[in-house]
Every structure is written in C-alpha cells, then in structure tokens.
Amino acid sequence: MIEFSSGAVRDLKEIFDWIAKDSPAAAFRVVGRLRQNIEVLDDFPQLGKTGRIENTFELSVSGLPYFVVYRSGVDGKSESILIDAILHTSRNYPTVE
C-alpha cells in the first residue's frame, strides 16, 4: 500500500502548478508519469537506491528531472510505502538546517 505524506502531496501540486503555467497538458503528463513510477513501488519496494537520509530510498524517474524520496516497511508492515517527497533534481537535498 502506498501512502503520500502531506509534503509529497504538496510537492505534486507545486510541480503541476509550475508546469501548468506554460502547458496544462504537459503538467498532466508529468504528474501522471510520476504517479505511474510511484505505483511500481507497490510491487518492487526496493527499486530505488539507498537514500541520502537514513531509512529512505530514492527513485529516479526516467526522462524527467525528478526523484521520489520514500520509505519502505513503514509501521512494521513490509508492504507499506510512504512517499516523503517528490523533488526536482536541481534541488539541494537534503537541506542543511
């Protein structure tokens, strides 16, 4: 089961809004492609590489300048996936606080 954090939902909305300023159709395509890649994690939760933050994974989205930060086995359930963030590859991640 895949769940989205409130931050990941916000990320998707911001990605959509940014692209939609120039092309609503492209925004739908990009967000749709991101969601398709995320859905694959339901069957292949270890598909991403080890993340830069402990206990996370990062999934690159082929052909798009975005990556998905997620956790597998949330709440002790091996089949659960939590999407933490969806970020542009140009972002400084993780941010230093």
Q: Residue ranges of each PLM-predicted region?
A:
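Σ70-family region 2.3-2.4 aromatic/basic alpha-helix that recognizes the −10 promoter
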Residues: 35, 63-64
